[in-house]
């Protein structure tokens, strides 16, 4: 599939596609939009037809240096006001740090950052605080030990108090399984959910993140399995695509690679009406075309 070969249809500027009463709420990562100050960035997201955004403060804000000390109620309320004025939901507040960092001092700093994001989210009114699932090294890189039972238990043990903290603020934490990280399969994600057993822990499902060169031929099975085992816990769907480059997968815009988007969107349409679907790995030049590809295909499946 390729967005350049798709016959684009005209849709409402709100960034949603209405079909039979169901709505897919499409968003974008704020740092994939051309940089602008917040009071221009969020209106620009709306003008491009997106209904929600995934925002990582350190990647999207350059007017000042975001940090725990800047995450005040006032900043949260300012962003919330801008979003309300422009009809843009905050689907995900990103806090993509390594909860299994083996350095005790760095781990302590990471925990404080998670707590700050949870407090911030409670005022901002976002869908979830999103995170990936870490690695057993300080560099946050792949090594086989990431997939060990010991690594999984480390992640569960370190995530549990974060989720407990989120419960106190009425905030949902959502983990995003990634093949190179500790939670690298649908089954391991289910184990984490069952072990922590909290309604404040849910899933960001990104099918491309669960693929590597050794299992791309099983992508349909993985998508189906995710909607079987994780169905009630999927809060957000990340939408990107992939191409194979050597022994690695390169992430690219949805509809321009090898992912089975008819299957994914059919599942979303059947089981997850109104779910936030945020695009990833777009660039300003193809973001709108990618949204239109998603909307047209969604109307057809």
Task: List the model feature ranges, each with a label.
Residues 40, 77-78, 82-86, 100-203:
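Active-site acidic/histidine proton-transfer and metal-coordination neighborhood
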Residues 24-35:
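Boundary/entry segment of secreted carbohydrate-active catalytic domains
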Residues 40-59, 125:
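Catalytic domains of carbohydrate-active enzymes, especially glycoside hydrolases
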Residues 25, 53, 59, 93, ...:
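Acidic/histidine-rich catalytic cores of soluble enzymes
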Residues 34-45, 109-118, 219-227:
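Short, acidic/polar
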Residues 10-23:
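Short, Lys/Arg-enriched N-terminal segments with co-localized hydrophobic residues
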Residues 45, 53, 83, 110, ...:
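Conserved, mostly hydrophobic/aromatic
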Residues 56-78, 133-139:
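Glycine-rich, proline-tolerant flexible connector loops at the mouths of alpha/beta enzymes
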């Amino acid at each position: 599939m390729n967005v350049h070969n798709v016959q684009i249809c005209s849709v409402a500027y709100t960034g949603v596609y209405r079909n039979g009463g169901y709505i897919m709420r499409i968003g974008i990562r704020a740092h994939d939009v051309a940089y602008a100050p917040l009071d221009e960035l969020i209106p620009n997201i709306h003008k491009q037809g997106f209904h929600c955004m995934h925002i990582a403060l350190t990647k999207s804000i350059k007017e000042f240096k975001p940090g725990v000390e800047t995450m005040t109620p006032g900043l949260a309320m300012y962003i919330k006001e801008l979003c309300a004025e422009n009809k843009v939901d905050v689907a995900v507040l990103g806090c993509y740090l390594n909860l299994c960092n083996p350095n005790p001092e760095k781990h302590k700093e990471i925990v404080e950052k998670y707590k700050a994001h949870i407090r911030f989210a409670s005022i901002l009114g976002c869908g979830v605080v999103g995170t990936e699932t870490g690695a057993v090294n300080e560099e946050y890189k792949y090594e086989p030990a990431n997939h060990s039972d010991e690594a999984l238990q480390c992640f569960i043990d370190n995530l549990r108090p974060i989720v407990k903290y989120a419960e106190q603020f009425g905030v949902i934490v959502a983990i995003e399984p990634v093949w190179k990280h500790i939670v690298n399969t649908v089954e391991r994600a289910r184990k984490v959910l069952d072990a922590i057993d909290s309604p404040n822990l849910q899933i960001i499902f990104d099918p491309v993140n669960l693929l590597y060169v050794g299992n791309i031929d099983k992508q349909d099975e993985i998508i189906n399995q995710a909607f079987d085992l994780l169905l009630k816990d999927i809060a957000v769907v990340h939408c990107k695509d992939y191409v194979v480059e050597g022994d690695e997968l390169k992430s690219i815009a949805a509809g321009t690679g090898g992912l089975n988007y008819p299957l994914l969107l059919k599942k979303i349409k059947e089981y997850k009406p109104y779910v936030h679907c945020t695009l990833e790995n777009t660039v300003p030049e193809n973001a709108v075309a990618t949204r239109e590809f998603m909307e047209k295909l969604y109307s057809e499946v």
